[in-house]
Structure formats: C-alpha cells, structure tokens
Amino acid sequence: MSKPNNQNQQNNQEQIPEDANELIAQLQAKLEDIVASGKQPYPNTFKRTDYAQDLQTAFEGISKQEIADNDAKGEKTQVNVAGRVMLNRGAFIVIQDMTGRIQLYVARKELDEETLADIKSLDLGDIVGVSGYIGRSGKGDLYVHIEEMQLLTKALRPMPNKFHGLADVEARYRNRHLDLMTNETTRDTFMVRSQVISGIRKFMLNERFMEVETPMMHPIPGGAVARPFVTHHNALDMPLYLRIAPELYLKRLVVGGFEKVFEINRSFRNEGVSTRHNPEFTMIEFYQAYADYHDLMDLTERLFNELATDILGTTEITYQEEDISLKAPFERLSMSNAIAKYAENFDMARINDRDYLAEYASTTLKQQVKDVFGVGKLQTIIFEETAEHQLRQPTFITEYPAETSPLARRSDDNPEITDRFELFVGGRELANGFSELNDPADQAERFLGQVAEKDAGDDEAMHFDAEYIEALSYGLPPTAGEGIGIDRLVMLLTDSASIRDVILFPHMRRKLEG
C-alpha cells in the first residue's frame, strides 16, 4: 500500500464560513454564474489519457533539469489529466484521481484571462480536466504545466477538511464517498480488497477450479449453523431465505460432475453486529473432489502465502501492533489439545464427561448451558471461550465434534469427531473446511439432530433438506470443501480493527432524526 506523503497531508487553509448553508449558497451561485455565461457546468467532452500515479512512476528519478532540457529540444511530454481539486494555492493546484495526486502549475503570464478567471473561481471538490506538459518544481514535485483547463463538474457542497471534516468513525461509514475522497488510508484499504478478491480468483483458476454462481434465495436455509433473513416470493407465494452459505448447492454441482468449483459472493446471517461480524459478508467457498481436509489446509497455506507476497511483498505482517507470520507451515492443533493448552484448571481426564463439561462451562465460563447440549457442543463452547482468542499466529484447529459439524465427515479413528478444521489468525476465525460427509444415511441422521435442536429453541440449527439428501443418494465422490471469510482476510492484510473498515457500505443503525 502507498504511504501518505507530505503533499497528501497538506490541507487547504481557505476560510470556511461557520454556516455551512452560506457556503452551499455561494457554490450554488457560482453554478448559476457558469450557466448564465453560456458555459456547460457538466460537460462530457474531455478525454483523459494519463493518470496521476502513472506519471509519478514514469518520471521517478528524472530531474527538473532533464525535463527542462527535453522541453528546450521540443520534446515536451504532453498529458491530459483529470481529477478532483484537493488543494488550491494560487500557483499550484493539487488534483486527485483514482490512482493518487498530482500538482498543476498555473503560469499566469501564459494563460488567457478567461482561463485564469476559471482557475480563480475553482473550489475544493470541483472536478477538472487539464491538458498540458510535464514539469518539476524547485522542491522536486512533479506537476502538469497547464495549457488548457476545463471545469467538468461543479461541486455544490463543501468538502470536509481538518476543521470541518467527518466528525467521527460512524460518520465515515455513513458517508463513505466523503471518506474515500479525503482519506488515503481508506482508499488504500479498498484497493487491497480488490486485489485480494482478484488474487483469490486467479489462484483458484490456476488450480483448475471452475467459478460458478448459485442461488442467493433459498427455499430452505442451509449450509451453515446461523439465523437466516426471511423474505417472501409473491408470484410463487412462498417464503424464501437469503442464503447463509452456498454449500449445499455447490456440493450438488460436484455430484453432477463439476469436480472443482468455487464461488465468491455474499452470504447473509441475521445475527449481531460487531467489529468482526456484519449481517452481509463476502466469502469464497470451494469444493474439490478426491481431496480431504489435509489437502485443503495445504492449499490454504499456499493461498495466504501467495496473496501476502503478491499484494504486500512479504509474508511477515503486523496486525494491530502484533507481528504475524503468514509463512507456511501453519500450526495444526486438535480442539482437545487446544483446550488442554489454554483452558485454566480444566481436567482433561473428564474431556468427555458431559456433567463436568456443563459445570465448567456454566460455572467457570459463565456460559448458558441447555439440556439439549451434548458433549461435543460443550467442548466447542469451552474451546471458543478459552482458546480461540489466544490463537494469534496462523493455526489450524482440527478434530471438531460431530455434534457441531453436521455436514462434515466423521473421522475413521473416532466417530465422535470429524475431519474438519478452522483456521485462526489474530484470535479470529478466517476459514472453515472439512472432508465432506457423503453418506446420505448419516447426513439424514445429522439433519434430524439439528431439527431436534431447533425444536428445543436453537434458532441457528439447520433444517432438514430432503432435496440435498436425494442428491447425495446419487453419489458424492470423496470431497473436501472450505469457506474463507474475505472481509476478515482483508482486515488482516490491511491492519484494520473493524470489519466496517473493509466493507464499503456497512450496515448501520437507522439514524435518528433531529
């Protein structure tokens, strides 16, 4: 990611009237003057040929004298740039485009009165197109020597600055357009997000996975343990659920013969909002026939290594002042061993004693325990409360209980646990994968167990999906599947504290009037 430079840190010192409405009125009056003069305030005829950062890169290391020598030989570098006015200091104007910033030089003796008047009337936030040639200032800053300038869009509201900026973090989320306009860190974050998604797609395609699309509205919610959003299809007169995961549809594609598939898309869960959770989130899910969960752990290590190297240039990163290494191999630790390592005063000899687990969870950890909770559910609660937040370096937790893994294949060594893993980094889950359960009878039994939990009051338990059981009956080859939370991965790679920092338009509470 690019680092802010001195030019980017400068703020316009123009005095802004205390009454914002007064300034808005002034901007509106300028627009009316433009219209009255017969000019088009919103033309669409300027053709940009050059970008700010491309020019900065192309002329890096070329001195002011070298540029001047080329000019003297009639070899001026003609450019056409466009962007938003971020700073106006008379002789120099700074504009910003999608790649960065560049200065414009106003040579007053070389410009006609009309152009000078147009330049003088510019306000911060106006969008201009400029034709000219490259130069370099005495301070070493690259600039475009203005020959022609055209106002492309007149701003009718004042831009935030250090005196009248976005008041708080919530204001940034609600006004992302202003946040992007004025905050370089925010722009960098979402550039990295774009690179992460395109990098994942490139990696999967190189691994011979096929990208697919599956329904966003499901007749039965499934594929994960979560509470769904409910809607209604008027024409079909039936309830539908925004998907909580695409898993069951993707595995039906593997049944159909697409042996390596992936989907990058959003899922929806009608649950709480926090620094780690947003009701609408982006994930990649992928499935590979003739593979097991060990293969996917290996693939995940390669993916994370490649993304960090390609985007950041290193696998050694810092997240919230903590050094983290994304270099393979990652630690692999069973859930029971994680409990043994991190749960204080826990008697491992009683790891399968339900009464002891319930007492530890309720008394020591102050967790609500229901009668329907079995040994596996209680083990998972204890792991989540004692170990999860302490998994700072990349760690695969394996051997999840079958009770809390209704879609995962049972272990050949112990039918009470599954061939499943979750990847934790910085104390947060980033990925969940397992060897898929492809026994239709076992899957039906697991669904019935989930239905029993739902009947007992667990809103997040799964429904019984008869169509999926029927698909399994045709034969799902040995398969492994995984889901990776892209939002949390971007948080990690951009050192962002909150998931809202990496979602362009996060869900917010309704803003109260007045």
Swiss-Prot record:
E.C. designation(s): 6.1.1.6
Keyword Protein biosynthesis part of the UniProt annotation: yes
Protein name per UniProt: Lysine--tRNA ligase
Manner of cofactor binding, per the entry note: Binds 3 Mg(2+) ions per subunit.
Matching HAMAP family: Lys_tRNA_synth_class2
Organism this protein belongs to: Psychrobacter arcticus (strain DSM 17307 / VKM B-2377 / 273-4)
Gene Ontology molecular function: ATP binding; lysine-tRNA ligase activity; magnesium ion binding; tRNA binding
Pfam families: tRNA-synt_2, tRNA_anti-codon
This protein's UniProt keywords: Aminoacyl-tRNA synthetase, ATP-binding, Cytoplasm, Ligase, Magnesium, Metal-binding, Nucleotide-binding, Protein biosynthesis
Gene Ontology CC terms, in alphabetical order: cytosol
Compartments where located: Cytoplasm
Positions bound to Mg(2+) 1: 422, 429
Superkingdom: Bacteria
Catalytic reaction(s) noted: tRNA(Lys) + L-lysine + ATP = L-lysyl-tRNA(Lys) + AMP + diphosphate
Sequence positions that bind Mg(2+) 2: 429
Cofactor: Mg(2+)
Presence of the UniProt keyword Magnesium in the record: yes
Gene: lysS
Main location: cytoplasm
Family in the record: Belongs to the class-II aminoacyl-tRNA synthetase family.
